[in-house]
Amino acid sequence: MSQNSESIRMVLIGPPGAGKGTQAPNLVKQFGAAHLSTGDMLRSQVAKGTPLGVEAKKIMDQGGLVSDEIMVGMIKQELETNPACGKGFILDGFPRTIPQAEKLDQMLAERGTPLEKAVELKVDDELLVARITGRLVHPSSGRSYHKLFNPPKVEMTDDVTGEPLVQRSDDNAEALMKRLNSYHQQTEPIVEFYKKTGIWAGVDASQAPDNVWTSILKVLGKN
C-alpha cells in the first residue's frame, strides 16, 4: 500500500465492531491523511491544557457533554496545526447529530476544505454481536483475539506471554445491543443528511477486511 499524491477529506461512520479501527489506518497509509478521532483529540487537548481543553475538562468534570462549538473548534485547530492534515483527514466519531454536521460543514466551507465523502460501514446487528462478544484482550499489550475468528493457541491465554486474556465488560451482548440501539438512533439522521448533500456512500462491512478495503477505495473513486 503506497502513499499517493491524492488527498482525501471524509467522515467514517460505523457501529462498534464494524472495523473502523482496521480501516482508518489503511486510509492514513494510503493517503498520508490525518486520522482525527474526536475522542483522542479531546483527551489530547485536555492533557495539553489548551484553552479548549481546559474548557472541555471543566464541562466533563461536571458530567456535562462538551458543546458542538468546542468540538468543531478542536477539529479546526487540528486542521490548522497538524501537518498531516495537509493531505486531508479521516474524521471518526464526529459528527453525531445534525447540528454538529451543519457546524462542521460551515467551518470546512469557510476554510475551503469541504467534505468529499461520508463512508458508512454497514453490518447487521446480529453479526456485530457475534464479532464483539467474542473479543478477548491481553490487557498489558493490547493484543486482541477472537473466540471464533482469531482464537488464541491456548484458551483464554495470550500467545506471547501466556498471561490470561480478558473480555471487556462492555463487550457483553446486552450492553452491546444498547450501544447499537443508541448508535442507530443517533446515526440514521446523519446518514440521511449526507445522502441529501450527495456525499454518502455505503460499504458492506460484513466482508473480510481486505474486501472492505477494496470497496472503500472503490466508493472513493481511488482504485
From Swiss-Prot:
CDD domains found in the cross-reference section: ADK
Ligand binding (ATP): G17, A18, G19, K20, G21, T22, R135, S144, Y145, Q207
GO biological process assignments: ADP biosynthetic process; AMP metabolic process; ATP metabolic process; DNA replication initiation; pre-replicative complex assembly
Pfam families: ADK, ADK_lid
PROSITE patterns with a match to the protein in the record: ADENYLATE_KINASE (PS00113)
Swiss-Prot/TrEMBL keywords: ATP-binding, Cytoplasm, Kinase, Mitochondrion, Nucleotide-binding, Transferase
Record's subcellular location: Cytoplasm, Cytosol; Mitochondrion intermembrane space
Alphabetical list of SUPFAM superfamilies matching this protein: Microbial and mitochondrial ADK, insert 'zinc finger' domain, P-loop containing nucleoside triphosphate hydrolases
Residues engaged in binding AMP: T38, R43, G64, L65, V66, G93, F94, P95, R96, Q100, R168, R179
Annotated region described as NMP, given as residue ranges: 37-66
Family designation: Belongs to the adenylate kinase family. AK2 subfamily.
Protein's job: Catalyzes the reversible transfer of the terminal phosphate group between ATP and AMP. Plays an important role in cellular energy homeostasis and in adenine nucleotide metabolism. Adenylate kinase activity is critical for regulation of the phosphate utilization and the AMP de novo biosynthesis pathways.
Subunit details: Monomer.
Record protein name field: Adenylate kinase
Gene: ADK1
